[in-house]
């Protein structure tokens, strides 16, 4: 924030990043917001234009708790990371880790690093072995 000498901007990401010149940042970060933008592919392309690398994180809809809720309740899951009911959520593009990996492959986005964690931002053996089932938060470095 400003008191820590960090510039903070608030803007509509769906309108793009036109106010920034190409390659004006080393990193561009999209934290826990991918699921709320209208055109994720366009935004990631814009982020890659503006920054040398980007960091994207999102809640994993493939986590076992979401699957259990859908299976047994037959309703869209409500979790710590996705706390809204389907009818009042800002989320419009929920995805799993596997969905995002395929999305990156299909769009030639090169993932250079990934970190899959639980809601406390801790990695475990299970999040490493079966990330799509046990990871709650996915973070990717892309160039």
Residue positions per predicted region:
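S-adenosyl-L-methionine-dependent methyltransferase catalytic module, highlighting the catalytic core
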Residues: 41-46, 53-143
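A short SAM/SAH-binding and catalytic strip from SAM-dependent methyltransferases
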Residues: 26-40, 58-59
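Conserved SAM-binding strand-loop segment of SAM-dependent methyltransferases
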Residues: 4-20
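Short beta->alpha connector loops
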Residues: 14-15, 34-39, 120-122
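Alpha-helix C-terminal capping/helix-to-coil transition sites in glycosyltransferase folds
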Residues: 23-24, 50
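Short glycine/proline-enriched coil/turn segments at helix->beta-strand junctions
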Residues: 3-7, 49-54
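Short, hinge-like loop/turn segments at secondary-structure boundaries
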Residues: 5-9, 26-29, 71-75, 130-132
């Amino acid at each position: 924030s400003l008191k820590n000498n960090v510039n903070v901007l608030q803007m509509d990401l769906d309108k793009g990043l036109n106010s920034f010149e190409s390659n004006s940042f080393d990193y561009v970060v999209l934290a826990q917001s991918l699921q709320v933008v209208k055109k994720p592919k366009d935004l990631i392309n814009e982020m890659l234009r503006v920054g040398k690398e980007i960091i994207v994180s999102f809640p994993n809809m493939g986590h076992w708790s979401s699957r259990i809720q859908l299976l047994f309740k037959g309703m869209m899951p409500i979790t710590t990371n996705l706390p809204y009911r389907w009818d009042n959520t800002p989320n419009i593009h929920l995805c799993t880790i596997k969905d995002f990996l395929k999305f990156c492959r299909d769009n030639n986005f090169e993932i250079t690093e990934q970190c899959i964690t639980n809601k406390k931002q801790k990695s475990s053996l299970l999040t490493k072995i079966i990330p799509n089932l046990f990871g709650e938060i996915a973070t990717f470095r892309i160039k």
